[in-house]
Amino acid sequence: MNKNNIIGFLLIAVVLIGFSWYNQPSAEEQRAAFVQDSIAKAKHAEMEKASKAAAVKRQADAKAQIEADSTALFYSALKGQAQKVVLKNEKVELTLNTKGGTVEKAVIKGYVGHNLKVKDGSADQKDVTLFDGNDQSLKFMLEAKEANIITSDLYFTPSNVTDKSVTMTAEAAPGKTLSMTYTLGDDYMLHMSLQTEGMAGLFSPNCNKMSIDWSDKARQQERGFMFENRYTTLTYHEAEGGTDHLNEGSEKIDEKIEETIDWVSFKNQFFSAIMVAKDNFDKDAFMTSIPQEKGSGYLKQFQAKMKTAFDPTGKKASEFEFYFGPNDFQILKNTEKESTFGKDLEFQKLVYLGWPIIRWINRFFTLYVFDWLSNVFPMGIVLILITLLLKLITYPMVKKSYMSSAKMRVLKPKLEAATAQYNKPEDQMQKQQAMMAEYAKYGVSPLSGCLPMLIQMPVWVAMFNFVPNAIQLRGEKFLWMSDLSTFDPIFEWNTNIWLIGDHLSLTCILFCVANLLYSWMTMRQQRDQMVGQQAEQMKMMQWMMYLMPLMFFFMFNDYSAGLNFYYFISLFFSAAIMWTLRKTTNDEKLLAILEKRYQENKNNPKKASGLIARMQALQELQRQQQKEMMRKQAELNEKKNNLGK
């Protein structure tokens, strides 16, 4: 990039900034727009509130009418006292409420439940409560002739109760029942079947579907609200394969799903609640995500309204499976073995591993190495060992890249001598050709160091996607870091500062300092190998390279300590490798080797091949085109002069 390019980019930036500033609304216009927006939101909220109130009133009126009629369906089931039934194993504990007959509390064992009000972790709980009480709601709705049956209104009677199973039954009339049977497996999967008995004549003729309304307020489980919120999504799996999620933002999202789906998940960063339908959920399921305010203890409020198959004769049960557990890739993948539906559920896709090539690296390399090392070493040591392993794998490419730069460095005096005559701006093409010819004499490819660096990029991006989703880092301590899965603040305050937030992360600062050091070393190395005007232009580019660590600080201050620590260690080792290579490279010996190669090429000239040959051919073509343009311009000028005479 030459001086004119830099000036051009700066002018474009100034024009864009100036245009944006000129076209921004005035303070009065902003206030007016804010007032109009507030009025519109208030009206919408009022209409929505009125609609919900009307629906609640209609339901209450219908319920009151049924309660007043002792002959109505489920008359006895509309009154009662709520009881708790607990199903548990070594992995999870689920509390069912006989009012509604569904799970009202899910506790995941073996994972630290953070007390977010105590920052030092001294009051953390030994287990994670995924939801409790009013956080979650699940109701099934059936269209009967007399009135709609809504399970959340009914009091069920538990029977056949064990630690892993229970049957909930609500009596519609003598000999007519609605039952829900739950069976808990050995891991995180809960099987449920809903079935009627003796109620075939009570339903509408076209009643072969049931409606499901499932909602949940996703709890904030981690100390970093913004970071956890980013990974908290309503995700669903299409019956034909593949997952998708709502594109949540700062506003409420309503979306109709046009495909048939077989499961829907309310996913936190590290834990999920999943509902699977054996006969799939029909098209046009309606999904909602509402963001919650920071400090409320919640991240988002999810709701899924769906329909699935229902047999009113009672011959076939409607079957569902629930997963309440961690977003651990291997656990999610192995959970399918507990499913009785025979589907390829692909739960493991809840763990985001990056774009296709990045996902492939994480899926078949990082995951296995990480799991293997984590069985032996603490997580902090695992990150260091993974860094060392990756550096060992990429070392041959790094060395090749460095040696290419070193060769150009020792050839710098010869390049300056060979290009000394090309000092004018119009001579830049000839100068480039002379440089390439000089490199070819010594068998040096100026771009041979680029490909190894490009090959390393997917590895760096793979770790960027893997570490924030690695539940193994959650709650793990290392050195001064109390939890590798969230930021490690050295200073915190109550107000939110633009770009920074409400804290300073120590590992982020270390990463940025290491980045600054590494940038200085690489810039110095590149400057030492550049000739003439290129070296001067590189000095102008330094400030851009030095701004990168500052940009990274604003980007990564909210990221997990584990990720920042990995980048810090990676850059530290990269700087150490570069320093070692510089100290162990003898410029005189390297130049002697190149001189020997030059003499061999001189005595046995070979045709240039590969990248150098293509670049030389391209430069020659450009030179010929430039020469032809100059000739035509000279002819045109001569004609103008003749006409002037």
Question: Locations of the language-model features?
Answer:
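Helix-loop-helix
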Residues: 1-57, 96, 194-197, 206-229, ...
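Short, Gly/Pro- and small/polar-rich lid/capping loops
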Residues: 49-82
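Soluble non-transmembrane domains of integral membrane proteins
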Residues: 77-345
